C-alpha cells in the first residue's frame, strides 16, 4: 500500500496460490519431482505464500484488505482479513487470460458470498471488465462494467461494523454441518435396517 506521497504504508503477500501457476504443490515432499518440473516446464512460477491477513489503516474509520485475484476463493483468507480489522475488501484481479468466458462472472458471484459471509463491502477491480462495488448485503452499489469494457465506477460505500455469525463462528458452522450429516447417515443406516426386518 502506497500513500499519496509515495510512501510505503505496508505490504500484503498473496496467501492462496494457484497450483503450477504460482507454486509447485508438495515441492518440499517431492523435491525430485519439483526439480524435474522446474527443468521441463518453461516459465513455471514458484512463489512462497503469504502468512498474514493484512489490513491497512486508511484513516480512523477505514481499514482495508486487498486479497489478490484467487485469494477470494478461500473463505478463510477473507475471513482472516476481516477478523484482523478490515471493514472494506478490495480485490484486484487479472482475468484477461480467461478471455471471453464466464470466469469474471464467477469471480463476482464468489465476491458476493465473501461480502455476505463477513458483512463487509467489496470492491472488485479487474483488467478485463466486470468491475463492480458490492455492499455488505451482497447487492451492487454501482453499475457493473461489461466484459472487456473500459470505464470508471463510483459508489457510496457505508462502512460500519455489522455482526456476522459466519465470520465469528465459522468453525462451529462447519462442525455443525459435519455432525448433522453424520447423524443423518446414522439415521439412514438404522432406518434401512429396521425396514429390512
Q: Where do the language-model regions lie?
A:
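Enzyme catalytic cores with a strong preference for nitrogen-chemistry domains
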Residues: 1-197
